[in-house]
Amino acid sequence: MGEALNGLKRTMMCGEPREEHVGQKITLMGWVQRNRKLGGLDFIDLRDKTGIMQVVFGEEINSEAFEKAKSVRPEYCIAVTGEVVKRESVNENMPTGFVELKCESLKILSESETPPIYIKENLDAAENIRLKYRYLDLRRPDMHRIFEIRSKTTKSIRDYLEKNDFLDVETPMLTKSTPEGARDYLVPSRNYRGMFYALPQSPQIFKQLLMVSGFDKYYQIVKCFRDEDLRANRQPEFTQVDMELSFVEQDDIMALNEGLIAHVFKEVAGVDVKLPIKRMTFKDAMEKYGSDKPDLRFGMEITNITEDVKDMDFVVFKSAIEAGGSVRALCLKGGATLGRKPLDKLGEFVKTYKAKGLAWIQLKEDGVKSSIAKFLTDDVTNSIIETMGAETGDAILIVADKESVVFQSLGALRLELAKQFELIKDKNEFNFTWITEFPLFEYSEEEERYTACHHPFTAPMEEDLEFLESAPGKVRSKAYDLVLNGEELGGGSIRIHDMELQQRMFKALGFTEEQAWERFGFLLQAFKFGPPPHGGLAFGLDRMIMFLAGTENIKDVIAFPKNQNAYCYLSEAPNIADEKQLTELGIGILPKQEKQEQE
């Protein structure tokens, strides 16, 4: 049984003692990192979140403590009191390595079984074990550092926004399901049998209602939930830095958030963000980088060579051009040395992005080599080389198809080449850009209708309003994303604040007037009472912390994350609900086979 503190107070953290504390009597508390014997003495490395301190036990120092220390094992939680003395053998690798504590009193506060993971930095352990014993994983110093960064970041964000007159307002967690986008997490109501709340995917409608309420500037650091198929760096519940402002335009919101980013990155990471952050339209981003979140830490832009090859007698190029597609290419510097096997692998790679294949031209010292050599004339080859700005030693990698496939496949290939050939020279670089003028709609082949690229409340650009009903695919939006090193850090838009325009938007999305009022009636009703022009933005806090902490795994920055299947190894959630609870809610569970037949 563990001993009680009985009034004993910790006077210093384990990582704090230095030479100036020699001669002082202190009390430390923490966990045993390791213990060892040497020359009739026992040594314990005592650890807390600040670091490690060596504690020495000896018969001549204190016989009772010396005897007690013999039973101590790794991860025992203990308290030690004694005098700080200079170490005979200095350890310059530790901040506390010039001193040690001569233990005069030892309390074993609690014992520990042999831990399933070793508490150390850069732990190499299976993810399911780390998540099951997350409380042990979180004892590691590198994990503590991440959560100190997270805490410092949220404080920095709050300081900046409140200095700019933002008000922190909480919005409901139990809200209405408005199916549009990702699936909702549903919560059954006991009081309203057969009815459900939804956990919010974002506070979108409520923050707009706060603008109608005259709050002017709102922010919230808030949990959001999406029941979607998880990718590597997605979680079913995530944290968002959410904000909304009244009487603003796009430039106002972007300028404010540039200031926020500069403030946070300087205060938390000592990084100077160059302002103003550059801007790029969605169209330019797709045409140059094949992505609406381009990584600008390296070059290799996509180049359109359709004009150069339009007269070639090569059916792949010809059919793509005739179908309204294009032929585009990347120039890989030094790519002429690639053999047939790696080139074939790149061809297989682009096929995973629906491309039909990859044509290539290599500019070798002894001439041109190409997978489509028999279709190339000297004039066409020279024209392609000139357009691409290619030189001897380079390779030109070509895809022909409809533009969505060309952009997607070459965009992915560009990133793959950057990885293979280590084109990103400075891994610590933070390269920001704004992407603007997103399409307002995208066409869903599955649903056979247009869906909102962002959400149904995004304002269209005035000059494109004439196409809202006749050609929705042409309409650009007042939406903007902030991209960092090829990842979306945040996004937002100017909102529709006119009820008539909002109803037109719903109609363009295929909603009847009745459906629009059923789903969003509380917003439309509010729009009858003088809504101000407004807009906002939301940052993914978890992703921001990943950048600031230098980790590529989102699970590292969340205290108790789920795995890729939205399962919690620690608490074993989700679990089977009690039959009594289900009866109270009026819920019955279909057998698995019956459920599949229903589907």
UniProtKB/Swiss-Prot annotation:
Binding annotation for L-aspartate: 180, 226, 454, 495
Compartments where located: Cytoplasm
Region (Aspartate): 204-207
PROSITE patterns: AA_TRNA_LIGASE_II
Signal peptide positions (record): none
Keywords: Aminoacyl-tRNA synthetase, ATP-binding, Cytoplasm, Ligase, Nucleotide-binding, Protein biosynthesis
Stored Pfam families: GAD, tRNA-synt_2, tRNA_anti-codon
Positions annotated to bind ATP: 226-228, 235, 488, 540-543
Domain of life: Bacteria
Single GO MF descriptor: ATP binding
Oligomer status and interactors: Homodimer.
Role played: Catalyzes the attachment of L-aspartate to tRNA(Asp) in a two-step reaction: L-aspartate is first activated by ATP to form Asp-AMP and then transferred to the acceptor end of tRNA(Asp).
Name this protein carries in UniProt: Aspartate--tRNA ligase
Species whose genome carries this gene: Clostridium botulinum (strain Eklund 17B / Type B)
Gene that encodes it: aspS
